[in-house]
Amino acid sequence: MPKHGKKYLAALAKVDRTRLYSPTEALALVKETSYTKFDGTVEAHLRLGIDPRHADQNIRTTVALPHGTGKTVRVLVFAQGEAVQAALDAGADYAGSDDLIARIDRENFFDFDVAIATPDMMGKVGRIGRKLGPRGLMPNPKSGTIVPAADLARTIREVKGGRVEIRNDKTGILHVAIGKVSFTPQQLSENFVALMDAVKAAKPSGAKGTYIRSVTLTSTMGPGVPVDPVAAQNLKA
């Protein structure tokens, strides 16, 4: 096991691992136990009662966090014609067609966080799917990143404003950033409520037994704070 430093151990000592905290208590404790010099990210980790081996039980959806994540999101748009300039005018960091595809393919250009595409571009974008897919950058209708040209501006604004993708890993756990340590408790709470509501709404019909089995809140490099999953699901903004 990796050895932890004194600051981490001091933070860990403030967390009672034998109890489940209310969301309000947990968020306060996450802020208190953050010890990084930079403004750390607050993350929620949810273990779900799903079987990721079955495609129909995997979670892939989006949620618009009311206060965003506190992170500057770099957006790349695959489009052509007038849609390219429209995307740039709406705030996209990069927009183009064959030029961007070639740059990604030849230069391994990945200086962006989210890729959006119009449907007519997917035939070309598919050629670099082997590079975009493993990085979680492949446009997908389930994540709301394949949209008609008329919806580009709205989608770009939503992504820039705090819309995040929710997607379980291969063990059935969600890892979602819900803000920064510098956020107020109210901002973090409202973002957390939005996340929980989205996860509940995305419950697969094939999921058996308890759906949300455990919830943990943490900050960058900080200790995990266990949360009562029932209280987390009942929390209101």
Curated annotation (Swiss-Prot):
Binds directly to 23S rRNA. The L1 stalk is quite mobile in the ribosome, and is involved in E site tRNA release. Protein L1 is also a translational repressor protein, it controls the translation of the L11 operon by binding to its mRNA. Keywords: Repressor, Ribonucleoprotein, Ribosomal protein, RNA-binding, rRNA-binding, Translation regulation, tRNA-binding. Part of the 50S ribosomal subunit. Pfam families: Ribosomal_L1. One of its GO terms (molecular function) is rRNA binding. Belongs to the universal ribosomal protein uL1 family. This is Large ribosomal subunit protein uL1. Transmembrane segments: none annotated. PANTHER family: 54S RIBOSOMAL PROTEIN L1, MITOCHONDRIAL, LARGE RIBOSOMAL SUBUNIT PROTEIN UL1M. GO terms for cellular component: large ribosomal subunit. GO terms for biological process: regulation of translation; translation.
